């Protein structure tokens, strides 16, 4: 039960913020004459902001330290980026939610509160309903843009990108509702998903920088190439899983540093671009989320290896002490 509560709240703390920001970026990207589209995008923004607010209000001492320390939920730049983006876009952003989130404390291993079960279940069901609407809205927008029926300042690839992220969120919520857990997916599948997301971030950054920012454009292009090579190696199975994870982690740690420097530069007006400050912080948080996933998988693998070695040593000692003729490979222990 505690795991269900913790995983649900952690999932929404990250993804509900991401979804409300998607709606904000779409709202800001429409022409003034597209009043109906703006109203619908703003409606989704307000609905996900309300969901996010409600999740934050019940998350104190019910989520893990790992996610609070990962800088995937908020960074030191989030509030300044929200305030600057509100000034630039005219979209009202409730930064009090971010302030409350900053004050959250960990306690994910001690959340056996039966009263929270129905609360969390309602949150999951509410998120699922909102996601169905938001995904449909994004897909309709992409179709209309492809037929030149509506203009939005965001790339069509960015619309596809945020549809995939919304569908991942929906998939995770469905798993929580159906199984009260999140299934352990093939790590390669997770890496491929997020390497694709990171590659597209690099492409978006490259395309939104001012042409005068030659060095930053070159750096962004290099990251796009690195992630493309990782995806190609995965498709061709040219790399062992452990080595692939190591390369993905190393690249993403560097890319996170690049994004953080970019966020600071945009907030300080030192970088010429048309990148919204909150978009810069948004893609930084997604990189930090991916880093946590990779590091968690690495830590789990190390624990499994240690447990396996300990088990084999125990069995070998047992056989040496109690068997007349110890046999090679006699260990039948399972983790």
Residue ranges and their predicted role:
Residues 1-335:
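Surface-exposed peri-terminal alpha-helical interaction modules
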């Amino acid at each position: 039960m505690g795991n269900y509560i913790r995983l649900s709240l952690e999932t929404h703390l990250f993804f509900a913020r991401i979804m409300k920001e998607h709606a904000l970026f779409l709202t800001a990207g429409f022409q003034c004459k597209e009043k109906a589209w703006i109203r619908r995008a703003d409606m989704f923004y307000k609905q996900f902001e309300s969901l996010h607010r409600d999740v934050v209000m019940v998350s104190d001492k019910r989520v893990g330290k790992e996610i609070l320390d990962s800088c995937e939920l908020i960074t030191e730049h989030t509030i300044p980026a929200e305030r600057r983006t509100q000034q630039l876009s005219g979209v009202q952003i409730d930064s009090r939610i971010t302030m409350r989130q900053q004050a959250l404390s960990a306690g994910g291993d001690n959340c056996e509160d039966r009263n929270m079960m129905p609360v969390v279940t309602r949150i999951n069901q509410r998120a699922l309903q909102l996601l169905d609407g938001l995904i449909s809205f994004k897909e309709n927008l992409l179709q209309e843009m492809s037929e030149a029926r509506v203009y939005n300042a965001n790339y069509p690839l960015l619309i596809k990108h945020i549809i995939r992220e919304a569908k991942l969120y929906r998939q995770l919520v469905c798993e929580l509702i159906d199984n009260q857990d999140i299934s352990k997916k093939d790590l390669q599948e997770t890496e491929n998903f997020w390497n694709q997301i990171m590659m597209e971030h690099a492409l978006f950054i490259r395309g939104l920088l001012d042409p005068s920012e030659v060095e930053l454009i070159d750096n962004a292009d290099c990251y796009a190439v690195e992630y493309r090579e990782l995806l190609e190696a995965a498709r061709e199975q040219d790399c062992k899983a452990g080595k692939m994870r190591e390369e993905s982690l190393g690249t993403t740690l560097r890319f996170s540093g690049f994004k953080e420097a970019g966020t600071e530069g945009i907030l300080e007006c030192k970088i010429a671009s048309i990148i919204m400050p909150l978009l810069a912080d948004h893609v930084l948080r997604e990189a930090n989320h991916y880093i946590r996933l990779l590091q968690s998988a690495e830590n789990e693998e190390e624990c499994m290896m240690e447990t396996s070695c300990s088990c084999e040593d125990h069995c070998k000692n047992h056989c040496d002490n109690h068997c007349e003729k110890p046999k090679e490979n006699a260990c039948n222990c399972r983790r």
